[in-house]
A protein has these predicted regions:
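Asp-based phosphoryl-transfer active-site loop
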Residues: 461-478, 657
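Conserved acidic, metal-coordinating active-site core of Asp-based
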Residues: 558-659
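Short beta-strand scaffold positions
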Residues: 122, 144, 192-193, 371, ...
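Mg2+-dependent phosphoryl-transfer enzymes with acidic/Ser/Thr/Gly-rich catalytic loops
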Residues: 620, 627-705
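Active-site phosphate-binding/coordination module
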Residues: 482-573
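Receiver (REC) domain switch/active-site residues of two-component response regulators
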Residues: 188-189, 522, 661
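Structural alpha-helical scaffold elements that stabilize or flank donor/cofactor-binding regions
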Residues: 113, 183-184, 339, 460, ...
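Catalytic cores of nucleotide-sugar-dependent glycosyltransferases that transfer UDP/GDP/TDP-activated
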Residues: 1-360, 364-448
């Protein structure tokens, strides 16, 4: 049986034809790469099937193509679209609250397949987060490509003058970096485009190990990107440029990218505007995606265009600068060739460039390069010898590089020929796919798999629906009348089982539960998720213990956190567990949790920290949590998550209410859960204790389904 490979590409507008590159900040070169990689892999004889999972979008503002649940790409490759969060299109920074729901959907999709993937390849931080969760739950190796890394972006934005607060507000950079750390901790293989990316950018992450990385430079589609002009294509490009340029036959300085801050296009316009020599020799051509009404653009795009328009006006560049409003994706190769025919230069002024696929495309079409001296372009220029690098943060240096690049026609021809030959030799798609498969097969076959993981149900579910009750808060002081009503309602529905959620150990939880006189529970999720048990007698689940114990070093956790005393004090032995280390805080200080997480990352411990009731902190194995225990249970029972109602109340319980299960927040809840009030699958009870549980059961009609 051949390989089944599953790729995760969650944000942007992704389809198999007519990619809307540059339409917004999320639909860029990464989109092209993932599509071409999927097609290239599917064409290999050892690969049977390739699925690219993305988000299903139902939004009148975008094409109905993105609402198609299944799109064949040919040759065994497919796009699979799964719903996640609101139906409307969302930029990637707004997707974070819904990624647990996507992880649930991907897990269910894989569990329903006759064959599970040989590996999951996650692209970018959001998919890395989802991929890490699915990999943990199903025991499938994870391959990760960050494409653009949060720590590097944060560094560049800080250098550009933005504050930490501004960066966080615009880019949700903290969640992105945390997601990248989590993906790196789980990955069997990290695909990078260059040595610099591995040695300098990924190396800033605590969870990254150098031996995880393999440098596999992307390839170029030689069928599209080549130096030979196709009949009629030049006139099409001229029609795009004609409204803007007085002397359209001048040598162009061309850039093709998205209108986002990182691409640094205003700096290129200013360098051009400051140089009479550049204006005499060249036109400036900016292909920045397709745009319609500026009022409908995202703020970042709108700001970039505003800066460009102001610079054109300030330097009086009318007739010298082209910025076409619309173009078709299939015109991009023709635009490169049109520029090459006029002895043009392709310019990449980006502040940071993990690789630079457009540099390869331009070179394949015979266009020399002037590029940022950051990341991938260094490797490309070293291999291709077809242009020069420049410090794009220094306008004088950028201006000088552009002036020198167009000064010598013989050198231009040498650069052109070098680029065409080097791309053919070093950057073919066949070579990329062969190298990719070799690295992934070797790393993923050696990846440590759990001794036992659930992919299909191992037993028939004992119930059709499951109510999970918080034992520590929701029923702590329940009135007898409310408990009696709840008891009667639950006993009347044999298809609905109950389970207990608690930070206590089994002995303590059993004593507390006995006081409630409720029907016996089918399941116990205890010690904050580190202990999973079944039935009234509390039979331990050995598969869960095996799953979470991998890589767990309880003694090392205690040693690492000793340095935080007296901020943290170990709780008494009766509150500890084999897979749970519990502390009490000296004071409920906001920064302690992040301090603990940072220490665990720095020491590369496979552990996670949670704060409860503002005073208590638990450290568990990386794979252990109440939310993960619920999903392990549902996979084993074959119970759909939307048939599970989770009652939550405590600080740190937000993760219980993410994803596909139904959520009920008790009236006595911690204020940190108020952020979930707009979630469609989260109901906030207004009545106390057992009455609130009954209120939630009625809201969802949970006992009458």
């Amino acid at each position: 049986m051949g390989y089944y490979l599953l790729h995760l590409h969650l944000h942007g507008l992704f389809r198999g034809h007519g990619l809307e590159l540059g339409r917004d900040a999320d639909t860029g070169g990464q989109t092209t790469y993932v599509l071409e990689l999927a097609k290239g892999l599917a064409a290999r004889p050892e690969v049977d099937r390739v699925d690219v999972v993305t988000r299903l979008i139902q939004d009148k503002r975008v094409s109905p193509d993105y609402a198609q649940a299944h799109e064949p790409l040919g040759g065994g490759a497919n796009i699979v679209r799964l719903p996640c969060g609101p139906r409307r299109y969302l930029r990637k920074e707004l997707l974070w609250p819904y990624l647990d729901e996507m992880a649930d959907a991907v897990t269910a999709h894989i569990a329903a397949q006759p064959q599970r993937p040989n590996w999951i390849h996650a692209h970018y931080a959001d998919a890395g987060y989802v991929g890490a969760l699915v990999s943990q739950r199903l025991g499938i190796p994870l391959v990760f490509t960050g494409h653009s890394l949060g720590r590097e972006k944060q560094r560049r934005l800080l250098e550009g003058g933005l504050t930490h607060e501004q960066i966080e507000q615009t880019y949700a950079i903290g969640r992105r970096i945390d997601a990248e750390e989590r993906a790196l901790a789980q990955s069997a293989l990290v695909i990078t485009s260059t040595q610099q990316e591995a040695q300098q950018q990924y190396a800033r992450y605590n969870r990254f190990e150098a031996e995880q990385a393999a440098v596999v430079p992307p390839g170029v589609d030689a069928q599209r990107f080549h130096p030979v002009a196709m009949p009629g294509e030049a006139s099409d490009v001229e029609a795009l440029m004609e409204p803007f340029l007085r002397e359209p036959n001048k040598s162009p300085l061309l850039t093709i990218c998205r209108a986002v801050r990182r691409k640094n296009v205003p700096a290129l316009v200013e360098a051009y505007g400051r140089s009479a020599l550049l204006q005499e020799r060249h036109n400036l051509v900016l292909v920045l995606g397709c745009r319609e009404d500026p009022r409908s653009m995202e703020k970042q795009q709108r700001d970039q265009f505003q800066q460009i328009f102001e610079l054109v006006d300030r330097f009086d560049l009318y007739g010298k600068v082209a910025y076409p409003k619309q173009h078709r994706g299939e015109q991009i190769p023709a635009i490169y060739r049109w520029a090459a025919q006029r002895c043009g230069i392709f310019v990449n002024p980006a502040l940071t460039e993990p690789f630079g696929l457009t540099l390869l495309e331009a070179a394949a079409c015979g266009l020399p390069l002037v590029s940022t001296d950051d990341g991938g372009p260094r490797d490309i220029l070293q291999r291709c010898s077809n242009g020069q690098l420049a410090d794009v943060t220094d306008l004088d240096v950028l201006q000088q590089a552009l002036e020198e690049a167009g000064a010598d026609l013989e050198r231009w021809r040498r650069w052109r020929d070098n680029g065409i030959e080097a791309i053919s030799r070093n950057y073919s798609w066949d070579a990329h796919v062969c190298s990719y498969l070799g690295e992934a097969e070797r790393r993923c076959s050696a990846w440590r798999r759990p001794e036992r993981t659930a992919v299909a149900p191992v037993q028939a579910p004992p119930v059709q629906r499951l109510l999970l009750l918080d034992l520590d808060v929701c029923l702590q002081s329940a009135q007898p009348a409310g408990l009696e009503d709840l008891r009667r309602r639950l006993a009347a529905d044999p298809n609905c089982g109950i389970g207990m959620l608690s930070g206590r150990n089994f002995a303590s939880a059993r004593l507390r539960f006995a006081e409630l006189h409720l029907p016996e529970p089918q399941v116990w999720i205890l010690e904050a998720g580190a202990d999973l048990r079944f039935g009234p007698e509390g039979r331990p689940d050995p598969s869960w213990q095996q799953h979470i114990a991998q890589g767990w070093q309880r003694q090392k956790v205690e040693q690492v956190l000793e340095g935080l005393s007296p901020r943290l004090t170990l709780q008494p032995a009766m509150n500890q567990g084999s897979c749970k280390v519990s502390y009490t805080l000296e004071a409920p200080t906001a920064g302690v949790l992040e301090m603990v997480r940072q220490r665990l990352r720095q020491h590369r411990l496979e552990a996670r920290a949670h704060l409860f009731h503002h005073w208590f902190l638990d450290v568990l194995p990386m794979r252990a949590s109440k939310a993960d225990a619920i999903r392990h249970l549902c996979l084993n029972w074959g119970l759909p998550l939307d048939q599970v109602l989770v009652v939550a109340a405590q600080q740190g319980d937000a993760e219980l209410l993410n994803g596909s299960s139904l959520g009920l927040v008790a009236a006595e809840h911690d204020h940190s859960l108020d952020q979930l009030r707009r979630r469609p699958k989260v109901f906030f009870a207004s009545r106390p204790q057992a009455w609130g549980v009954l209120e939630g059961l009625d809201h969802y009609r949970f006992l009458t389904r």
